[in-house]
Each structure stands twice: as C-alpha cells, then as structure tokens.
Amino acid sequence: MAFLKKSLFLVLFLGLVSLSICDEEKRQDEDDDDDDDEEKRGVIDIIKGAGKDLIAHAIGKLAEKV
C-alpha cells in the first residue's frame, strides 16, 4: 500500500511540475504577443499623426490662396 501511495504522489508531483512549466511558457508567449500589439499601435498612431499634419498643412495652404 505504501508503494502505491508513493507512486501516486510521484505522478501527481510530476503532473504539477509539468503544468507549472506550461503556464510559464504560456505567459511568455502572451507577453511577446502584447509587445507586438504595442508596436502595431505605435506605427498606426504615427501614421495617423502624419496624416493629420499633412491635411492641416494642405488646408492651411488652401486658406492662404483664398
């Protein structure tokens, strides 16, 4: 009976260790995805800002001519 308890304990322990390793890898993958999303948002914000500046400059030039 003691042998079965030790075996069961060992199986449960190894299962918990493998689960914790998988969780760590999952967190790292999620962090990498978050970094990519932040970079995409940064590029889009730059493009939007440049577009707004370009439109404002064009409107300013048109207003000067009128």
Curated annotation (Swiss-Prot):
InterPro entries: Antimicrobial15 (IPR012518), Frog_antimicrobial_propeptide (IPR004275), FSAP (IPR016322). Expressed by the skin glands. Keywords: Amidation, Amphibian defense peptide, Antibiotic, Antimicrobial, Cleavage on pair of basic residues, Secreted, Signal. Residues 1-22 form the signal peptide. The modification Valine amide is found at residue 66. Belongs to the frog skin active peptide (FSAP) family. Ocellatin subfamily. This is Ocellatin-PT3. It comes from Leptodactylus pustulatus.
